[in-house]
């Protein structure tokens, strides 16, 4: 990263703290993607907390999408709009749920809690997305690194509770030697 002293010096020399790059991303936006402590410094120096990029994404959107709870909290505490919509019509909460997968479930639950506590609005689509996160997680459960499994499980339970979603049944795989017992009835109900 760029040393704080250099950031301060550049601003003192007249560099526009909100100057966008080709994609409309400001220095604050870029640092929010990385979850860097420089976010706090840029805000203290006057960076525009709500300035979106070319696609309408704010620094809060990308801090959430890249799973940086500490940065999300800082941006919320400094007044970022939790209901700002990007060009796809997604809020930071909708965005983090859209990109959530496997080992990031715990961070997603933490970020979702912060955003909801700050006034972010839930939608029916979010409830459906949480259910899909659960289905995807259960399908891939056996392939998830055991070091992350407990945190992901806890995060998933938190998401289920936050969005009032019935937990997806845990996937049971055959061990290759136990007898297979088939329930009576048509195959769709088994």
What is the predicted role of each segment?
Residues 5-6, 37-38, 70-71, 111:
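Conserved ankyrin/ankyrin-like repeat signature
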Residues 97-190:
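Ankyrin-repeat-protein effector appendages
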Residues 13, 33-35, 45, 66, ...:
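Ankyrin-repeat positional consensus site
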Residues 1-3, 30-36, 62-68, 95-106:
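Ankyrin repeat A-helix N-terminal signature
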């Amino acid at each position: 990263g760029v040393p704080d002293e250099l950031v301060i010096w550049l601003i003192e020399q007249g560099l526009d703290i909100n100057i966008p790059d080709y994609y409309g991303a400001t220095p604050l936006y870029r640092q929010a993607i990385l979850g860097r402590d420089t976010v706090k410094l840029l805000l203290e120096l006057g960076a525009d907390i709500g300035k979106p990029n070319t696609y309408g994404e704010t620094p809060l959107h990308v801090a959430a999408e890249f799973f940086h709870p500490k940065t999300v909290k800082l941006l919320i505490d400094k007044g970022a709009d939790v209901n700002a919509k990007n060009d796809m019509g997604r809020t930071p909460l909708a965005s983090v749920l859209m990109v959530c997968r496997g080992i990031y479930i715990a961070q997603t639950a933490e970020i979702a809690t912060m955003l909801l506590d700050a006034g972010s609005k839930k939608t029916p689509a979010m409830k459906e997305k949480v259910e899909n996160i659960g289905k995807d997680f259960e399908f891939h459960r056996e392939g998830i690194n055991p070091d992350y499994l407990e945190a992901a499980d806890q995060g998933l339970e938190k998401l289920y509770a936050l969005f009032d979603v019935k937990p997806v049944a845990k996937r049971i795989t055959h061990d290759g030697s136990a007898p297979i017992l088939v329930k009576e009835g048509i195959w769709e109900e088994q």
